[in-house]
Amino acid sequence: MNYDTSVFKKNLHELNIDLSDNQVNQFLTYYEMLIDKNKVMNLTAITDFDEVVEKHFIDSLALIKIINLDQQLSILDLGTGAGFPGIPLKIAFPKLKVILADSLNKRLVFLDEVISSLDLKNISTVHGRAEDLARMNLYRENFDLCVSRAVANLSTLSEYCIPFVKVGGQFISYKSAECNKEVDNARHAISLLGGKVKEIQKFEIGDSGRAFVSILKEKSSPKKYPRKAGVPSKMPL
């Protein structure tokens, strides 16, 4: 099927991202696989091509606004869902080493199919809850960067994500532009976990106000965090 990629390329140009024809085709294949699988599995409420481009692909890639992604960073995408932002980041920035984590295995089966179809390297999936994975030596404090577009309170997200990050690394949360109060309410939790709010960068994609909340990991997270499965969401720090 032919797609009008003019809006996609315009948005890429505004982010100073230059993709090869092969990379653009990888995005198109990803879109087709997403829409096809969405017929039998709830992956996205957005299915129109230009909307998926803007609200999923470009929103994911906008991370370039706050960090240089053209380098060999190890990235954990926690609560990846349909693969955002991890797969768009991997397509556009092949040097990245990416792990996609989710608690729902059938999503990861789909993402493994995408990874195989797009012939992506140095990207894999892991099934489990953040509270359990963060206690495993294989993952704890092992990533340069943890990212999440998951819809959750920042205090809860911080308890999920910060323990995965190396000291000196960052946790970056994708939020709406109206996040200042949420960030202020999360500062205590962030500090307990060894982090510090480094930057809040606001921007617009189409008619949506968006923000990146960048949290720098200054010291090792206490071993008692994250707490047992279910506790961080029910009783935020």
Model-flagged regions — what are they?
Residues 93, 165-167:
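Helix-to-beta-strand junctions that scaffold the AdoMet/dcAdoMet cofactor pocket
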Residues 150-151, 176, 219:
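Short glycine-/small-residue-rich Rossmann-like dinucleotide-binding loops
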Residues 61-150, 158:
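Conserved SAM/SAH cofactor-binding pocket of Class I
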Residues 168-178:
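Conserved beta-strand signature within the Rossmann-like core of class I S-adenosyl-L-methionine
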Residues 184-237:
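SAM/dcSAM-binding transferase cores
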Residues 34, 89, 175, 215:
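Residue-level signal for inorganic ion chemistry
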Residues 1-72, 76, 112-123:
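Class I SAM-dependent transferase core
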Residues 107-109, 179, 183:
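Short alpha-helix immediately C-terminal to the canonical SAM-binding loop
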